[in-house]
Regions:
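Small beta-barrel nucleic-acid-binding modules, primarily SNase/OB-fold domains
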Residues: 1-155
Length: 155
């Protein structure tokens, strides 16, 4: 009797829960980078602007601020890495920022993870204002860049 009651309750709860959630598999897009706006923003074919998730580099194009120290170097690094090249995009839970830019992780054809590489080389830091999939990895990469005096962390 108890077994039947338990099975009935489980079936009822399953129906109430609705359909199972889709797995959070990344959605990949293959695209072409036509230009680099700054160290953490690129423009793709079709004019779409992409803000790299979890990365903040010194500003170079914000009209409200002067060019920040190491901003030109960060922009040049991103330009060398992706401008004029095919890339793959992976999105996270938030797909657009407040400026309408696409939010994405960017990968090169050889598999290099651009967002992580910018932080690893010291061209930017982990931007943790909002939660994201690779947050702990990026925080660790920034710590290592600081400890090894890479890029903007050079003494």
């Amino acid at each position: 009797m108890l077994v039947a009651l338990a099975l009935g309750a489980a079936a009822y709860l399953k129906r109430q829960a609705g359909p199972p959630e889709r797995s959070r598999q990344p959605v990949w897009q293959k695209r072409f980078c036509v230009r680099v706006i700054d160290g953490d923003t690129i423009e793709l074919d079709g004019g779409e602007r992409v803000r790299l998730i979890g990365v903040d580099t010194p500003e170079t194009v914000d009209p409200r601020r002067p060019v920040q120290s190491f901003g030109k170097e960060a922009s040049a690094f991103t330009r060398r890495m992706v401008e004029g090249k095919n890339v793959r995009l992976e999105q996270d839970q938030d797909t657009r920022d407040r400026y309408g830019r696409t939010l994405a992780y960017v990968y090169l054809q050889d598999g290099t993870f651009l967002n992580a590489e910018i932080i690893r080389q010291g061209y930017g830091h982990a931007y943790t204002r909002f939660p994201f999939r690779y947050e702990q990895q990026f925080v660790q990469l920034e710590r290592e860049a600081r400890e090894n005096s890479r890029g903007l962390w050079a003494r």
